[in-house]
Amino acid sequence: MDGCLIVSHFHWDREWYRTFEGYRARLADAVDRVLELLEADPGYHFLLDGQTVVLEDYLAVRPQRRAALETALRAGRLGTGPWYVQPDSLLPSGEALTRNLLYGMRLAAEYGGRPSRIAYVPDSFGHPAQFPQLFAGFGLDTFVYWRGNGNEIDALGGTYRWQAPDGSAITALHLTDGYFNAACLPDDPQGAAARLAAYLAAKGSSAPRLLMNGFDHMLPDSHVGAVATALAALLGAPVERGLLDDLPAVGNGALPVYRGELIGGRLANLLPGVWSTRTPIKLANRACEALLEGWAEPWAALGRALGGPDEQPALRLAWKRVLHNQAHDSLCGCSVDAVANQVLGRYDSAVGLSRETITRLLERLAGHDVERRTPDVVEQEVAIFNPSPHPRTDVVRVALEPYPALSLQVGQPQFPRFTIAALEEPGFAIDGRPVRVVPSADPARTRWLPIESPLDVEFVAADVPPFGYKRYTLSRTARPAEEDDHGRTLEVDGLRVVAAEDGTLEVAFGDTVYHGLLDVEDLGDGGDSYDFDAVGNDPGAALASVTCRRLRHPSGLQRLEISRIFEVPLAVHEDREQRSEQGIALRLVTEARIAPGVPRVDLTVRLHNTARDHRLRLRFPTGAPATACLAATTFDVIGRSAAPTDDRGWVHPAPSTFPHQGWVSANGLCVVAPGLPEAEISSDGVISITLLRAVGWLARYGLRSRAQPAGPVMPIDGAQQLGPLEARLALLAGADPVAARDAELGLRGVIAGERPLLAPDTPLLSLARNGLQLSALKPAEDGDGFVVRVLNPTDAALEADVTFGIALAAVESVRLDETPDGGSASHDGAVVRCDVPPHGLRSLRIRT
């Protein structure tokens, strides 16, 4: 290309160092100007940052401009999509990224536009290796990006073929100088053209001749037409004004090929500290994804197939709140405190909507009265549901609300009975077996008396069928005593847990024993929301005291409660050279639980953070050296090296940490840590999981770990995360993604009724356990059936063998965008089979 393409655009962070509403006021001004320029200049085009949410945000305050906006979209002069929200690339789940593209393309079409076929990700902090497979599943053939390259970019150049582990490939175009190489042009068209001509000459003919005319939250330049004319005269070649879709096609055969992630800092800041900034946001995000992907979507799909109502509107509403939060400055936590508070508020809303939707879905299937009247009986039927495509035995916790034996009449007789707290300590049994009664930890549970919390019951539900439920009878009984002593050992079914004198755990899976688990590392952090920055002369955490309590219940549930108090420095000195001499006590409480029939250790970690400017990690020694570990990543399992990266000459030094999607495994020990996405594997075989990284600045200068600026220098005291923090982890033997997902999703129980849509002990969907994972079970976006998606994270081709408990009318192989892909899938009665390539995804539309 002798000439060049000028793309006028802005990059629009919906919230960052201003709140969403603060930026939306500026968005209204910016899009007003864009529409004026489109009307005045027939050659003008503008890219709305590749995210369709901008349309919603703008029209919410400018509804009278919808016709003008739709006219520009239909004419192809205003570019939007394919994303709904420009996301962070590494922290959302693969399914969340898929919903993002589904919603983005849907919204673009609703406004009359054609979503861009370019996967534009200008500013996210690195990218997963499976992006090419994701984008190919939506018919996107080009990836335009800035951050993430390591040393491979020296050989690849500005344009190359990026190949996913399954073999899918797209053309990648690297914005070497960012998405702003033609921003802030001089007012004089000739001067602006001269600057751009000099820039192009310096880049040479091998670089993509793409000029990105825009920057963060900037009003568009109004004289781009005159600049393009002047530049064409200087170059003696055509200068086009258009969108990224107007980029000329590049011959794939002549391009170098790259396979792997993009998580390097060779040419641009990677900013990996965001993987651990503001832990509550990460935990809330993962909880929402698990509720929607693991519970709400599957049961909405199956419930609809069984004749229940359509819950798609509720799912979309919840997903949109989650996706709003997956913009990189929101999910990454690198924003001001007001934004972080609003992000958590959206997650609370999404959690509430998801939980209520799930409860209603399960209650309908189990036949509970839609009016939820409490029958005047002394026993209650409960239904325990399994969200997995294989039988499960696991611990389940059921809320006693409503429960007749605990209900009293409040008010007039014509009003319903209400559940209130018991005046004495009740006991309960499930099918005659004792259950553990515990106070509810849910602050939203209704209370009618101030004397006691509402109650839950906990027990082990055995052999719950795949995507089905098991029915139990809950009855009142004498409350059995729980053994409470100072013992330090738990043991069941060949699984042993021992609390050491220092509060760490010894865990034995059969003959394989691991020592020193849950050791604590606490280091000073002089960095900011973007990067960890270690300080010198760090005393770390000094263990001050340890107490241990053992509780063993007749139900078979066994727990160790270990409380450790550490002395840590209060903060980092203002010069950031060392931590303060003044210390402060920091308390960490760990509950380790085992249960019969459940081959794992469940961990609940509660920290009350009292210190500032530090990173606290939980360490899991695996007992042997390690050159690498395995970790969950976007739509795959990936190997992570323990060796340092050669980062000589990099703009941003390579971190020793890495992001993960739920679990990390080395030397036979798997640490499941959903919502704690930062980990490290050391050469001596220690897995480290970051529990908290407390910082007080959005960005700072003078870091050892980063030479270039990253954002505005603003205090964010909320990111110090003072106060309580709770996280749930688990320990497993091996590296089984399915078992890790089971630990995360658990089981759920609801009150059962007399008119179930589904009979108990009926499996609705099962997947043969041969290494495949169920990635999605969801209603089809167009309402025509539902979609089953299977992931193969292994190096071998596998056959998916899916058995349904409902009659099937038709089966069709589809892409990720749920359009037919021409793939084959056999359908023999209730059994569907299809091949899944190594590291590949297969999606099937099921009609009933």
PLM feature spans:
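C-terminal (or distal) subdomains of carbohydrate-active enzymes
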Residues: 131-134, 158, 174, 183-185, ...
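The substrate-binding groove and active-site-proximal loops of carbohydrate-active enzymes
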Residues: 10-27, 49-58, 81-98, 114-126, ...
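CE4/NodB-like, metal-dependent polysaccharide N-deacetylase domain
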Residues: 98-140, 195-210
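Metal- or metallocofactor-binding catalytic centers and their adjacent structured scaffolds
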Residues: 253-368, 378, 740-753
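Acidic, His- and aromatic-enriched active-site or binding-groove loops in soluble protein domains
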Residues: 63-82, 132-155, 160-171
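C-terminal domain-boundary segment and adjacent tail
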Residues: 8, 46-57, 61, 136, ...
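N-terminal catalytic cores of secreted or lumenal carbohydrate-active enzymes
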Residues: 1-95, 99, 107-111, 140, ...
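Terminal accessory/targeting
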Residues: 1-45, 182-246, 261, 324, ...
